[in-house]
């Protein structure tokens, strides 16, 4: 069940290996700001940082802890592009705007590079990412992806690998080949999130934890954001709750929760591997996922643990299921111990298209990253900040993308997710 109010971090490898330990106070008195951000994950902190760099007074309200959600639990893979595929966006918004969307997707990685360097964020950032195919039909999809990226956008950072080339870097026999992207990469998500929080605070941003928002009212040209104990009065508000949008009252989300399907993803972390064993798994430091609908994703951590994740719909025997999945890929890890296992929701949309926009002229949102959140959240923070500062050109392009709704509330969403997972399992088995 989704819940975040007053929660502490889940125990995970990321939490135990965090390099900063912030404890921000709860909101106890009325505060005023230019912008109030609801949610202290990647998107909320990225937007706050962009605005603070421009001199805005920003307050961030977090119902739990900084990086409590996917920003502190994800696989840490920063992937450019979009899950839906840029060809669909050409149909929706035309070639010119689709080219702008593609360029923005490349900017997502530049933003990570820039912030890590500018604010000295220690988060084990490493370039290199491969999407792998389990059969020839899915390899054809990767071949087409590389062809379209090069032909339509001139992207030259992708390399097609056949099975022989892949085996030079990955110790698994189950794949027929892959598509390597030298620009995408991976990082320690919680340490990156905590680094963003420190950068925000250093620029004067106020962060309040354990301060879930219970109501929001627009009046007299301002927005009053209410917590259980106090309120923030601001000119503009940014909703940055992502997969937890359903938990908020309708007076806050105004129905945009219908765009989001929270899908549970699970990760295990092995004990530290010897260098020889680590090299037998991945020897070039890349992060990896397959191109199943319910995909496996994995990478080595800075201390040589294998972090292995998959999507599912049940937390029952999660560690055992993840271990079985891991051994299907890397049977050489049969005797390796699992030190950690944790789960968390991903904010998916029905068509995997990100949902960015405005509820009103003073209330902004971005969510629905659909597995691309490590990278896309930085871009979302930048373009929402641009809109608040008076330039909404890039936000307007995202507002033109079609994102279908799911009606019927959380019970229907849970049912739809479970049915969808079973359907995807069927497709993955037979396609």
Swiss-Prot record:
One family name in Pfam for this protein: DAO
Coiled-coil ranges per UniProt: none
TM regions (residue ranges): none
GO molecular function: oxidoreductase activity
GO cellular component annotations of the record: cytoplasm
Broadest EC class assigned to this enzyme: oxidoreductase
EC number: 1.-.-.-
Keywords: NAD, Oxidoreductase
Protein name as it appears in the record: Probable oxidoreductase OrdL
Native species: Haemophilus influenzae (strain ATCC 51907 / DSM 11121 / KW20 / Rd)
Lineage: Bacteria, Pseudomonadati, Pseudomonadota, Gammaproteobacteria, Pasteurellales
Gene behind this protein: ordL
